[in-house]
A protein has these predicted regions:
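Terminal targeting signals and extreme-terminal segments of soluble enzymes
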Residues: 1-166
């Protein structure tokens, strides 16, 4: 059986890939971008590049979401890359509330659906419920042939959330 398929989200085609923003935290603080991020071509949807916003801008209408094109050198990603990609993007709550400090993962489950057929992948991370600093972040990853190749869910905690969210 294979007639139920999760399609690429509409956000995939609402902006040109050239409008996406290279993930780079050095605007926040020089040297802040982790080395493992620098090994990855990661282009974030322009609506989700919270680190490029002015500090006084309102995040009220922003989604708790982060979408990106991902590519590592070496060709088509394997299952290890898919697992790595399932927790690679910034916490989605930063797009909604701005930088919040440490947001550790408590649990993470990744499902490898199939091996990708393209070297570039598209990831869409979203959260819909935040309660007392805890939230679940769902991720779906597609290859550019529109095959869902991996999905994940993680339970995450915003530390000192009452300072930023209440």
């Amino acid at each position: 059986y294979d007639d139920l398929q999760k399609p690429l989200p509409n956000i995939f085609s609402d902006k040109d890939k050239n409008d996406y923003v290279k993930m780079n935290y050095d605007k926040i603080s020089k040297g802040f971008t982790p080395a493992f991020i620098q090994q990855l071509e990661c282009d974030i949807h322009p609506d989700h590049a919270w680190w490029n916003r002015e500090p006084d801008s309102s995040n009220k209408d922003n989604e708790a979401r982060c979408s990106a094109f991902l590519e590592m050198k070496g060709g088509v990603p394997d299952q290890f890359c898919l697992s790595f990609f399932s927790d690679i993007l910034p916490p989605v709550v930063c797009n909604k509330y701005g930088p919040l400090g440490w947001i550790p993962t408590i649990t993470l489950t990744t499902h490898i659906r199939k091996m990708p057929s393209t070297s570039v992948l598209y990831a869409d991370f979203k959260a819909s419920d935040i309660n007392k600093g805890y939230f679940e972040q769902d991720c779906n990853i597609w290859d550019l042939d529109a095959n869902l190749v991996a999905s994940s869910r993680q339970l995450t905690r915003i530390l000192k959330s009452e300072e930023k969210i209440s």
